[in-house]
């Protein structure tokens, strides 16, 4: 490996910086003589934190500037929460590594109520996710969902101020930031199925940069990568992004089979189309396509067409 300085592009949020430093530490552990610098950046998504993701332009806004830094070679790699990645990457860029997946589930946080079932009628729940909103209302239509934006600490502060009676956040982010003590309940996946790739960090680099790909090869977790890419395949075929209430989650069973579950909902959770597929690990792409085709046959695209663009 050459002696050049490796530059990691990252957002400037506390969670993003933690994630970039985590990757840096793993790289230095494997390559002790490596020199690594972080390149913190403010993304378009960070500038729109007070707006709904839907109106601001979607999750791709959180990676656009980082990808531009890769393409113009200001950075050698970028660290992302894989759930923030659009289904399609720009030409010339690849997801070269999926790190071992952390907690994929959603967490309820409430200073007053100990579970979703304990929430009173008309309780105000904060989230910026249409997926969470739809599944919450499908489970309990008597809840009120209110948009919640900002980084983790901002969202927790809004909860503490009394603006919400509970909020929903990704458990992985809370755990990475040492804030797991705030978690009131890990929401079971039969109530709230995770979003595509939730809990997994990814490393993006230039497709033709074989040196960087060799460098990060050891950070790729094969099982996590298999599950994440299977989820992303379904997501891509459905045109998935944060504009639609769509959930997909892939796991490996005790019998070493691939289990894939997905669901599409309307905004108020009154309509839901779901599917479950299982099969051999080596047939992951076939299973993903079978799941997609089943959802479409059941009317997923018709249901999604009712979601405002």
Curated annotation (Swiss-Prot):
<comment type="function">
    <text>Tetrapolymerization of the monopyrrole PBG into the hydroxymethylbilane pre-uroporphyrinogen in several discrete steps.</text>
</comment>
<dbReference type="InterPro" id="IPR022418">
    <property type="entry name" value="Porphobilinogen_deaminase_C"/>
</dbReference>
<dbReference type="GO" id="GO:0006782">
    <property type="term" value="P:protoporphyrinogen IX biosynthetic process"/>
</dbReference>
<keyword id="KW-0627">Porphyrin biosynthesis</keyword>
<dbReference type="InterPro" id="IPR022419">
    <property type="entry name" value="Porphobilin_deaminase_cofac_BS"/>
</dbReference>
<comment type="similarity">
    <text>Belongs to the HMBS family.</text>
</comment>
<dbReference type="Pfam" id="PF01379">
    <property type="entry name" value="Porphobil_deam"/>
</dbReference>
<dbReference type="InterPro" id="IPR022417">
    <property type="entry name" value="Porphobilin_deaminase_N"/>
</dbReference>
<dbReference type="GO" id="GO:0005737">
    <property type="term" value="C:cytoplasm"/>
</dbReference>
<comment type="pathway">
    <text>Porphyrin-containing compound metabolism; protoporphyrin-IX biosynthesis; coproporphyrinogen-III from 5-aminolevulinate: step 2/4.</text>
</comment>
<protein>
    <recommendedName>
        <fullName>Porphobilinogen deaminase</fullName>
        <ecNumber>2.5.1.61</ecNumber>
    </recommendedName>
</protein>
<dbReference type="Pfam" id="PF03900">
    <property type="entry name" value="Porphobil_deamC"/>
</dbReference>
<dbReference type="InterPro" id="IPR000860">
    <property type="entry name" value="HemC"/>
</dbReference>
<feature type="modified residue" description="S-(dipyrrolylmethanemethyl)cysteine">
    <location>
        <position position="242"/>
    </location>
</feature>
<comment type="subunit">
    <text>Monomer.</text>
</comment>
<dbReference type="InterPro" id="IPR036803">
    <property type="entry name" value="Porphobilinogen_deaminase_C_sf"/>
</dbReference>
<dbReference type="GO" id="GO:0004418">
    <property type="term" value="F:hydroxymethylbilane synthase activity"/>
</dbReference>
<keyword id="KW-0808">Transferase</keyword>
